[in-house]
Structures are given as C-alpha cells and as structure tokens.
Amino acid sequence: AKDGYYVQQITAPTILDFCFAPTVRLLYSNARIGANAGRVALSRGGLIYALETQGAPSIHALTLDSKSPIVYQDGCLLAAGTCLQGGDHLYTTAPPKAVPCTLRFIPFCRRLNGKEDQMAVWVRTTD
C-alpha cells in the first residue's frame, strides 16, 4: 500500500472479496453552538445515529459514557450510559439517581419508522 492505494496483479478467474468495517466516531460540535455544548453525535460509515429513549422518562435523562466501547449490533449502536431517575415531584432537594443502562442508537434515517419514542442526535456525555 502506498499513498492510500493498494496495487495487486490479478488474473482471471480471480474473485475479490472486500470487507470494510467502518468504525464508530464521536463527533463534537463547536462550543459556540450552545444547544450542543457538552454533547456528542455518533457516526459509523456515512450514517449519523440517533438515541432512542426505550422507555426512559425523557431523552434528557440519558447520558452516554463516552469512554466505554460502542458496539455495532443488528444495525444499531449499543453503548453504556446512565439514566437519571427521580420521583414524581418536579423539584426536590435530593439529587436524582444515576442508574446504569444500555443506550441504543439507530440510524437517523430510520427514526420515523413507526416508533413514537423521543430521539436525539446530540447526546450528553460523562466527559
């Protein structure tokens, strides 16, 4: 390989199998974009992924552990995170509990396929 190219002499009947395993990347926006401050987006290949709530009380209660591995499985990305759980009161003097959970991200282009869960592309992180 040289300069990003691979050169190979082949003769017929040669079969070439290519397997590209795209890596998951964390994307950070400029800090001047206030709505995305302290948040990341996930991409794999050419796709951007959106976080699903999966029964969590709110998309805002979920936080991604950006230091843990992110696994590609069945077309989705799975990652460790936390879900903030509080009581029924809107305000309290006790902090909410941060319960470990698995976060599920689906390709953004599939986000409107039948589910009514809340979704977010830009997700809070533990950083």
Where are these regions (language model features)?
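C-terminal beta-rich recognition modules with glycine/proline-rich loops and embedded aromatic residues
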Residues: 15, 19-127
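Solvent-exposed beta-strand/loop surfaces of large extracellular or lumenal domains
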Residues: 1-9, 26-32
